[in-house]
C-alpha cells in the first residue's frame, strides 16, 4: 500500500469507543419519544424512518463500501474513486427523493398508510441528504483515518439526538421530526464536503468513465446482494405494516428493531477489517486473514452471547424501562430477535467483498433466502399473525448466516485445527447461562420490586457473574486483560485483571 497501517486493535478501539458513545446517545431518543407521542404517532414515526432507513441502505448499491476495496490498494486513482462515489450517491438520492416528493402515493403503496403522503416532500429531502452524507464515516475509515471517523460518529449522533429531541420537545409533532432530520442531514453533508476537500484535494476536478465502469462492475453483484440483504432485514416490517394497524406495527417494530449494542462492536470491527483484509488478500496472505476472522468471531461472541441471554431474563424490565409499559406486549418479538444475536458474531462481509470471485455466490444465497422469507411470512401470517412473520425472518436470517459463514471458511481454507481459535465460545455460553440463572433467582427473591430496579440490579449482577466466570474459565487472553486494565486504569484508576509478565 505504501502507507503504514495502524493496528487492528488500535483502529477498532477508536471506532468502538465512538460507537459506544453514539449508542448511549441513541438510547435517549426512544426513551423520550415514547413519552411524548402516543402509540399511533410512534407507529407513523417508525414507518417514516423505516422507509428512510431502507432507502439509505439499498440505494448506495455497495458504491460507498467499494472504498474499502479500492482505497487501500490505490495510490494514483484515489480521487477518481471518491468522485465516483459522490456522483453516484448524489444522483440516486435526487432520483429517489424526487420521485417520492412528486408521487407521494408511493408511500401509501409501500406501507399501506395514506397518512404518510402528507410528509412526502420532507421524506424525499431527508433521503437525499442522509444518503449523500452517509458516506462520511466509511470514507474516513477506508482511508484508515480512524480518528476522524470516530469523531464523525460521535458528532453525528450527538447532534442528531440534540436536534431531534429539541424539535420533538418544542413542537411535539411528526413533521417537526422531519424538519430535524433535514437539518441534521444538511449539517452532515457540509461536514462530508469539508472532509473530502481536506483528505482528497481536488477530487472534483477529474472524472474518468473507465474507472467508473470498473468500479460499477465490482460493486454490481455486491450491490444486488446488499439489496437482497436489506430487503430481507426490512421486508418483514413492511409485511406487518401492510397487514396490521399502525398501533400493531408500533408494537412489532419495538420488539423487532435494533437490539442494544447489536451493531456497535461489530460495525467497528468490520469497518476496520474491510480495509485490512482487502490489503492482505491482495498480498495473498490467506492464513493471516483466517486468523483475523476467527479471532473476530470469538471477540464478538464474547459480547453477543451474554447480551442475548440477558435480554431473555430481563427483556420485560428492559421494555418497561425504555419504552414504558404500553409496549410490554413487544416482548415475544424481542425474544425472537434476541435469538439472532449470537449469530451476529459470524461476520462474512470483509472476506466476501475482498474475494471478488465469490460475489455472485453471495447474491444467489441472499436472493434465495429472500424468496423463502416471502413464502414463509405470507403463509404463516394467516395462522400465527405477527409472530409468524417474525419467526420466518429469524429462520431465514439464521440459514443465510450459517451458509455464508461456511462459504467464508471454505474460501479461507479453514480446517478443524483452526477451530481452536473459537473454542472459548462455549465458555461464554456457559458463563452467560450461569449469570442468567442468578438473575432469575434475583427476580424470584424480589417479586414486588419495580421493573427499573430489577433491570439495574439484574444487569449489574449478570455482568459481574459473567465476567468472573469467564475469567475463571480462562476464556480471557492476556492481551485482552491488558487492554481492559489500560482502560480501567485510565478512567477508574483500577486494574481489573492480574496479567502474567
Task: Indicate where each model-derived feature is located.
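Transmembrane helical elements of multi-pass membrane transporters/channels
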Residues: 10-26, 156, 180-192, 196, ...
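Helix-loop junctions and terminal segments of transmembrane helices
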Residues: 30-31, 59-76, 141-142, 255, ...
Amino acid at each position: 500500500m505504501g502507507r503504514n497501517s495502524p493496528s487492528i486493535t488500535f483502529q477498532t478501539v477508536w471506532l468502538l469507543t465512538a460507537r459506544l458513545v453514539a449508542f448511549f446517545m441513541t438510547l435517549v431518543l426512544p426513551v423520550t419519544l415514547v413519552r411524548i407521542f402516543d402509540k399511533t404517532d410512534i407507529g407513523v414515526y417508525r414507518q417514516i424512518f423505516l422507509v428512510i432507513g431502507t432507502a439509505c441502505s439499498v440505494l448506495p448499491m455497495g458504491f460507498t463500501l467499494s472504498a474499502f476495496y479500492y482505497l487501500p490498494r490505490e495510490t494514483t486513482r484515489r480521487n477518481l474513486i471518491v468522485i465516483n462515489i459522490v456522483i453516484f450517491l448524489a444522483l440516486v438520492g435526487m432520483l429517489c427523493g424526487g420521485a417520492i416528493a412528486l408521487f407521494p402515493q408511493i408511500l401509501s403503496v409501500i406501507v399501506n398508510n395514506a397518512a404518510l403522503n402528507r410528509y412526502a416532500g420532507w421524506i424525499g429531502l431527508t433521503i437525499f441528504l442522509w444518503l449523500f452524507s452517509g458516506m462520511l464515516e466509511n470514507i474516513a475509515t477506508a482511508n484508515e483515518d480512524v480518528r476522524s471517523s470516530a469523531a464523525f460518529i460521535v458528532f453525528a449522533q450527538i447532534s442528531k439526538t440534540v436536534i431531534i429531541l429539541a424539535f420533538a420537545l418544542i413542537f411535539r409533532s411528526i413533521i417537526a421530526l422531519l424538519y430535524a432530520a433535514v437539518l441534521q442531514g444538511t449539517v452532515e453533508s457540509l461536514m462530508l464536503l469539508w472532509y473530502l476537500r481536506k483528505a482528497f484535494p481536488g477530487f472534483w476536478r477529474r472524472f474518468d468513465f473507465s474507472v467508473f465502469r470498473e468500479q460499477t462492475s465490482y460493486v454490481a453483484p455486491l450491490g444486488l446482494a446488499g439489496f437482497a440483504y436489506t430487503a430481507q432485514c426490512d421486508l418483514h416490517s413492511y409485511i406487518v405494516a401492510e397487514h396490521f394497524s399502525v398501533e400493531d406495527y408500533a408494537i412489532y417494530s419495538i420488539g423487532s428493531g435494533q437490539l442494544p449494542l447489536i451493531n456497535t462492536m461489530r460495525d467497528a470491527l468490520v469497518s476496520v477489517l474491510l480495509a485490512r483484509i482487502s490489503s492482505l488478500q491482495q498480498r495473498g496472505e490467506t492464513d493471516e486473514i483466517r486468523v483475523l476472522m476467527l479471532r473476530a468471531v470469538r471477540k464478538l461472541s464474547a459480547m453477543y452471547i451474554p447480551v442475548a441471554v440477558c435480554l431473555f431474563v430481563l427483556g420485560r424490565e428492559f421494555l418497561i424501562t425504555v419504552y414504558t409499559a404500553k409496549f410490554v406486549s413487544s416482548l415475544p418479538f424481542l425474544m425472537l430477535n434476541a435469538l439472532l444475536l449470537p449469530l451476529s458474531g459470524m461476520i462474512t462481509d470483509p472476506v466476501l467483498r475482498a474475494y471478488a470471485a465469490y460475489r455472485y455466490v453471495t447474491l444467489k444465497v441472499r436472493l434465495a433466502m429472500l424468496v423463502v422469507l416471502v413464502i414463509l411470512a405470507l403463509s404463516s401470517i394467516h395462522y400465527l399473525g405477527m409472530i409468524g412473520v417474525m419467526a420466518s425472518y429469524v429462520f431465514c436470517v439464521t440459514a443465510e448466516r450459517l451458509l455464508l459463514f461456511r462459504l467464508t471458511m471454505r474460501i479461507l481454507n479453514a480446517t478443524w485445527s483452526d477451530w481452536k481459535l473459537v473454542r472459548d465460545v462455549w465458555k461464554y455460553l456457559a458463563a452467560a447461562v450461569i449469570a442468567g440463572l442468578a438473575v432469575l433467582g434475583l427476580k424470584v427473591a424480589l417479586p414486588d420490586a419495580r421493573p427499573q430496579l430489577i433491570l439495574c440490579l439484574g444487569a449489574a449482577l449478570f455482568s459481574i457473574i459473567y465476567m468472573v466466570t469467564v475469567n475463571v474459565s480462562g476464556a480471557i487472553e492476556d492481551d485482552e486483560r491488558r487492554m481492559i486494565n489500560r482502560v480501567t486504569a485510565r478512567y477508574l484508576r483500577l486494574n481489573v485483571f492480574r496479567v502474567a509478565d
